[in-house]
Design a protein with these regions (language model features):
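Acidic, Ser/Thr- and proline-rich intrinsically disordered linker/docking segments
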Residues: 23-29, 36-118
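Conserved beta-hairpin
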Residues: 1-32, 36-39
């Protein structure tokens, strides 16, 4: 499962194993200064918007890859059901990152602390 962490002043979305192939993408790195909000959601599927292009998807099972629409682009790394972290960005290739995490609350809290968001 993908991991969100902070390394050298950047937010990094580490994709593991097959996720890189499923999402047609490598790790994503953005400056911490580009993070405008971090929140936890119970239903990551409700957060997905636009069409998947490119990526892999099967409703309620997996959504990994770029999502495109009038809003621009989001990147999703969603597996199964359960909590996720939604990171809203500005001035980067992606408008949002949507990532499932068993410990979504702790991940979001850590990211908020690193970015100075409350």
């Amino acid at each position: 499962m993908a991991d969100l962490c902070v390394e050298d002043g950047e937010l990094v979305l580490h994709l593991h194993g097959m996720e890189k192939a499923e999402g047609f993408h490598g790790d994503i790195r953005v400056p911490l200064s580009s993070v405008s909000a971090v929140r936890v959601v119970e239903d990551p599927w409700a957060e997905l918007r636009g069409i998947r292009a490119p990526g892999t998807g099967l409703p309620d099972v997996i959504a990994v890859g770029t999502r495109r629409g009038a809003f621009g682009k989001d990147f999703a790394a969603v597996h199964g059901k359960g909590p996720a972290v939604v990171v809203e960005l500005h001035g980067t290739e992606y408008a949002r990152l949507v990532v499932t995490a068993d410990n979504a609350g702790a991940v979001a809290s850590s990211l908020r602390g690193a970015t100075g968001l409350s």
